[in-house]
């Protein structure tokens, strides 16, 4: 991208916005002074003292959501706390979002794995919030982590998801998947430079789709050791 194009696009990104929960008491304001905690996401396994380590499943997924709802230190639920691999991937997002809606009243994270799944998530969330499509464009109710396919690439499903969410005014967190020594330079400076370039490209794309759409700069840079 041309530097001038990037600067012009990111200038429309909002410095503050609200992520709306179905329970207004759990809505959170995103800005430079607020810290928002959520669960980790996408663990393949879980464990406890009774049954030990096991593959992710819907029962445990639901129990983690109940914990997220109960704990006041978690402001939003985040993504799938454990991946429910007992649900077929083609319909997993439908079951997981239904569980979000029925077991929590906090904002949640959906997975931007293509336009169709994002459209399902938008429609289910819209209904749960009692909104029509136009008001929803001005009320961020969910978010998604958009990982780049480093180096310097956004794959098609993530790009489709990013654009669909931005068009509907829903929050996207652009998070480059940069591992130093693998898909990023091995030096700290090089890896962070790549992260910044990829993140700014994603932020700019969201604003090209809909100026003023809520967007955040995420970072994942680590190493392969």
Specify the residue positions occupied by each region the protein language model found.
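Glycine-rich, N-terminal phosphate-binding loop and its surrounding beta-alpha-beta segment
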Residues: 1-47
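Helix-rich catalytic cores of soluble enzyme domains
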Residues: 49-225
């Amino acid at each position: 991208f041309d530097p001038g194009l990037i600067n012009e696009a990111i200038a429309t990104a909002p410095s503050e916005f609200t992520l709306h929960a179905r329970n207004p008491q759990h809505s959170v304001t995103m800005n430079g002074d607020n810290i928002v905690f959520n669960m980790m996401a996408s663990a393949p396994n879980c464990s406890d003292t009774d049954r030990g380590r096991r593959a992710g499943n819907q029962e445990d997924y639901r129990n983690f959501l109940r914990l997220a709802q109960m704990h006041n230190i978690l402001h939003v639920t985040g993504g799938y706390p454990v991946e429910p691999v007992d649900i077929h991937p083609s319909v997993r997002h439908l079951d997981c979002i239904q569980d979000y809606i029925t077991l929590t009243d906090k904002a949640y994270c959906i997975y931007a794995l293509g336009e169709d799944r994002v459209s399902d998530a938008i429609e289910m969330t819209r209904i749960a919030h009692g909104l029509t499509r136009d008001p929803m464009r001005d009320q961020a109710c969910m978010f998604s982590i958009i990982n780049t396919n480093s180096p310097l690439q956004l794959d098609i499903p993530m790009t489709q998801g990013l654009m669909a969410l931005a068009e509907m005014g829903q929050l996207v967190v652009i998070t480059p998947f940069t591992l130093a020594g693998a898909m990023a330079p091995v030096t700290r400076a090089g890896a962070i430079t790549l992260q910044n370039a990829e993140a700014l490209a994603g932020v700019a794309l969201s604003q090209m789709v809909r100026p003023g759409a809520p967007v955040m700069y995420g970072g994942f840079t680590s190493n392969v050791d």
